[in-house]
A protein has these predicted regions:
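Positively charged n-region of N-terminal signal peptides that target proteins for export
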Residues: 1-4
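C-terminal motif of bacterial Sec signal peptides marking the signal peptidase cleavage site
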Residues: 15-18
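Feature captures C-terminal
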Residues: 21-32, 82-84, 88-223
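Post-signal peptide N-terminal segment of mature Sec-exported envelope proteins
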Residues: 27-49
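Post-signal-peptide N-terminal segment of Sec-exported extracytoplasmic proteins
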Residues: 41-65
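Acidic/histidine-rich, surface-exposed loop or edge segments in extracytoplasmic proteins
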Residues: 57-74, 207-213
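A conserved active-site cap/scaffold subdomain adjacent to cofactor or substrate pockets
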Residues: 77-78
Length: 223
């Protein structure tokens, strides 16, 4: 039986420009939570907002004692760490039951996190906003030498991707000092159990090393 974490119906409002060919100049602006509300957009989405209010999406799931965001650290962040840890806690009992093995590493992508967790009540709506893509969670068997490629990728990326089980130690110039898997030195010839998503397995975010997996297990979980 498939288990679904969260999914959301994304509403897109398309505004049409006039069909003339006048040259226009556009300035790029970063869109984030600090951008003020737009009254026209708010008017367009108000009917859908009311539908959400009347639905069970406002059901309270938990309470957060602090704000979690993916941008409060350079190589680590509170929200990325939370995502990776939560994925391990959910998936490891499932995989252990069917294989009698444990998950070694979790690697997701920072770009898959689309919102923040504010301090206070957490509703179903919050969960849907965080993960709108409903990616399939997979477990891959990777040899140690592929894990080395993973480490090199992460060093080059310098992003706070959600990671569990992999500890990477860099110097101030981002040169690798050492790394380990759950406190143990990597064995290049050993196989490791790595959890990721179908999007990343297909090369999303240029994580092409996942294609070198020895075996793929579908955990029947959607994020």
């Amino acid at each position: 039986m498939k288990k679904s974490f969260f999914s959301i119906f994304l509403i897109t409002a398309t505004l049409f420009l006039g069909c003339n060919h006048t040259n226009r100049h556009f300035d790029n602006k970063l869109l984030d939570h600090e951008i003020p509300d737009d009254s026209i957009i708010n008017f367009l989405i108000e009917p859908y907002t009311q539908q959400i209010i009347k639905s069970d999406l406002n059901t309270i799931l938990a309470y957060s004692p602090m704000k979690y965001t993916k941008k409060d650290g350079e190589l680590n962040s509170t929200l990325s760490n939370l995502f990776a840890d939560a994925t391990f806690e959910v998936c490891n009992p499932i995989y252990n039951e069917i294989s009698n093995e444990n998950i070694d590493i979790v690697l997701l992508n920072m770009g898959g996190i689309r919102s923040i967790i504010s301090k206070g009540e957490i509703s179903k709506k919050t969960a849907f906003e965080l993960m709108p893509f409903e990616n399939q969670i997979l477990l891959l068997k990777l040899k140690g030498d592929v894990i080395e490629e993973m480490v090199e990728y992460l060093i080059q990326e310098r992003k706070s991707h959600p990671i569990y089980g992999l500890q990477i130690n860099l110097d101030k110039n981002y040169n690798l000092k050492d790394f380990n898997v759950n406190g143990n030195k990597l064995n290049p010839n050993e196989n490791y159990n790595v959890v990721t998503t179908d999007y990343l397995l297909k090369g999303g975010d240029d994580m092409n090393f996942f294609a070198k997996n020895l075996k793929t297990f579908d955990l029947k979980i959607k994020m």
